[in-house]
């Protein structure tokens, strides 16, 4: 009883004393540690803790949520952001919202509705469509600075290009200067002179050939003119025949007159030149009185005169023929042939 009771009596007292001693210590440090964390996070949460996205992104979300045809007002955007993100600092929110709207307009993410004259963080805003978002940034960027820079760059390279174009002109001038040198080389060549002489000779031949052709060409109109001349020639021939026939008639008439005067000359003027038998008889009779002397000679004398009376029948006919009117169109050859035939018959 003594050892166990003693121990049991001591233990509660020790425990009570320990609990009483620990309880105030544990309570003291507890509040001290518990009081530090609430004060600690309150001071450290402002600089370290950022529990909302950038203001521009919140503005875009607000416009997407309350999308309207005429756009969303700035007051509606503020209410949406404060309701969704209560941790935003209200004091700085007005300034941050104004900056976010300006950056959105500059980047082409936001746009004002038509016929809106508001400026800054007033009025209403709209989202730009996606296809316009891609086009507008390109238009805005080149429209302001890049295009001017491009123009400046374009003007810059043009000057070297012009400088490059000048050397080709110099080269052209050099080529032009070289061409006269090429022209100076041909004169010493004999082949060129011979070729020129041949060309000149060929040109002269061509001119001669052309002149020969020109000379040959005129006879063609002569051939054309020959037709009327041939017709005139026929008339001339007919006239010549007529003149010849008239001349022949005149000659025959003269011959007949000569024959009528004397028989001898008529016989000598015969064309064929053959003596007729009547002529022989007349010559024989003329010789006969010459052979005999006396009165026979006187009788022979009248025979001479009678020789003119005794004329062949064909001769008498011939003398009568030209006196009468000759028929037109009868050829002379026919009359001459008739005379020759009559002589042959005699």
From Swiss-Prot:
GO terms classed as biological process: chromosome condensation; epigenetic regulation of gene expression; meiotic cell cycle; negative regulation of DNA recombination; nucleosome assembly
Tagged with keyword Magnesium: no
Biased composition (Polar residues): 334-346
Signal peptide limits: none
Domain spans labelled H15: 51-129
GO CC annotations, alphabetized: cytoplasm; extracellular exosome; nucleosome; nucleus
Pfam families in alphabetical order: Linker_histone
Sequence motif Nuclear localization signal, residues: 164-179
Primary role: May play a key role in the control of gene expression during oogenesis and early embryogenesis, presumably through the perturbation of chromatin structure. Essential for meiotic maturation of germinal vesicle-stage oocytes. The somatic type linker histone H1c is rapidly replaced by H1oo in a donor nucleus transplanted into an oocyte. The greater mobility of H1oo as compared to H1c may contribute to this rapid replacement and increased instability of the embryonic chromatin structure. The rapid replacement of H1c with H1oo may play an important role in nuclear remodeling.
Name of this protein: Histone H1.8
Species of provenance: Homo sapiens
Encoding gene per record: H1-8
């Amino acid at each position: 009883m003594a050892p166990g009771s003693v121990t049991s009596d001591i233990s509660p007292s020790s425990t009570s004393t320990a609990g009483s001693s620990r309880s105030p210590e544990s309570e003291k440090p507890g509040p001290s540690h518990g009081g530090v964390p609430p004060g600690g996070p309150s001071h450290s949460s402002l600089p370290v803790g950022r529990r909302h996205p950038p203001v521009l992104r919140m503005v875009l979300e607000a416009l997407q949520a309350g999308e309207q045809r005429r756009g969303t007002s700035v007051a509606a955007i503020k209410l949406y952001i404060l309701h969704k993100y209560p941790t935003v600092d209200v004091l700085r929110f007005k300034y941050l919202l104004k900056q976010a709207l300006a950056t959105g307009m500059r980047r082409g993410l936001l746009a004002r509705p038509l016929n809106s004259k508001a400026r800054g963080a007033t009025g209403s805003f709209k989202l730009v469509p996606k296809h316009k978002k891609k086009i507008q940034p390109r238009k805005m960027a080149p429209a302001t600075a890049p295009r001017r820079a491009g123009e400046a760059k374009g003007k810059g390279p043009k000057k070297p290009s012009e400088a490059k174009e000048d050397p080709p002109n110099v080269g052209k001038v050099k080529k032009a200067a070289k061409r006269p040198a090429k022209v100076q080389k041909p004169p010493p060549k004999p082949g060129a002179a011979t070729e020129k002489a041949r060309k000149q000779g060929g040109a002269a031949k061509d001119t001669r050939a052309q002149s020969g052709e020109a000379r040959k060409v005129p006879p063609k109109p002569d051939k054309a003119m020959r037709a009327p001349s041939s017709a005139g020639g026929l008339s001339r021939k007919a006239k010549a025949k007529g003149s010849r026939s008239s001349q022949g008639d005149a000659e025959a008439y003269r011959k007949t007159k000569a024959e009528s005067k004397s028989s001898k000359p008529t016989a000598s003027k015969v064309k064929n030149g053959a003596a007729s038998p009547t002529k022989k008889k007349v010559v024989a009779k003329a010789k006969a009185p010459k052979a005999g002397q006396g009165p026979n000679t006187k009788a022979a004398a009248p025979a001479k005169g009678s020789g003119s009376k005794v004329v062949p029948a064909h001769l008498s006919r011939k003398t009568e023929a030209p006196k009468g009117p000759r028929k037109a169109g009868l050829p002379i050859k026919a009359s001459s042939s008739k005379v020759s035939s009559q002589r042959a018959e005699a």
